[in-house]
């Protein structure tokens, strides 16, 4: 895995995957889509769609655990703090040989620099929340969210996907 290349692709994902507008109905649509995809693939995931401070969609699939719920919360907190995907932040920490606690003073009990939370961005408003999946390895969590956003925003997922690890 080439971290620098992945960071470039993630930056392109974050730039492209922007909603023209967003409301609770759209949150439900995206969340329900993620739920159905995860269910069809047998993924035991927690799915969380929220604006900062307001949950809009939450779902647990069969086999998901309280740890998945906590990971989703901490990944979402990372997006809220940095306004970037949790995977991008984790890769930057890996590249720097550091951690969120060491570099930014952010406790591991509240923040996670693992993939799976993606910024919920609205044109003209910026990052207003996060869309999070927890249940797979971090790269796969991240890509599942990207796949769902591509489906909802009319982008070709194959053009925005990370290279196979």
Curated annotation (Swiss-Prot):
Record-linked Pfam families: HbpS-like (PF03928)
Q: Could you tell me which InterPro entries the record lists for this protein?
A: PduO/GlcC-like, PduO/GlcC-like_sf, YBR137W-like
Q: Which HAMAP family match?
A: UPF0303
Would you identify the family this protein belongs to, as annotated? Belongs to the UPF0303 family.
Q: Which NCBIfam families match?
A: PRK02487.1-4 (NF002695), PRK02487.1-5 (NF002696)
* UniProt protein name: UPF0303 protein Bxeno_A1932
- Organism equals Paraburkholderia xenovorans (strain LB400)
């Amino acid at each position: 895995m080439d971290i620098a290349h992945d960071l470039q692709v993630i930056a392109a994902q974050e730039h492209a995957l922007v909603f023209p507008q967003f409301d609770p109905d759209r949150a439900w649509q995206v969340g329900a889509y993620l739920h159905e995809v995860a269910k069809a693939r047998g993924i035991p995931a927690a799915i969380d769609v929220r604006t900062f401070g307001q949950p809009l969609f939450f779902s647990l699939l069969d086999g998901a655990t309280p740890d998945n719920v906590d990971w989703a919360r901490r990944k979402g907190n990372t997006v809220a703090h940095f306004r970037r995907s949790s995977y991008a932040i984790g890769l930057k920490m890996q590249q720097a040989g550091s951690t969120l606690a060491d570099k930014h003073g952010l406790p591991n009990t509240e923040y996670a620099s693992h993939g799976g939370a993606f910024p919920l961005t609205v044109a003209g408003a910026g990052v207003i929340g996060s869309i999070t999946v927890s249940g797979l390895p971090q790269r796969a969590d991240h890509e599942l969210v990207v796949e769902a956003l591509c489906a909802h925003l009319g982008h070709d997922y194959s053009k925005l996907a990370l290279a196979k690890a």
